[in-house]
């Protein structure tokens, strides 16, 4: 899934 942490996009 796609998440957004502190303005940083991460893919898991």
From Swiss-Prot:
The keyword Secreted appears for this protein: yes
Keyword line: Secreted
Instruction: Identify the species of origin.
Output: Tityus obscurus
Q: Which GO terms describe its cellular component?
A: extracellular region
Where would you say this protein principally sits, based on its record? secreted
Task: Kindly state the tissue distribution recorded for this protein.
Answer: Expressed by the venom gland.
The name this protein goes by in its record:
Cryptide Pep-16
- Which lineage do the record's taxonomy fields give for this organism? Eukaryota, Metazoa, Ecdysozoa, Arthropoda, Chelicerata
Localization per record: Secreted
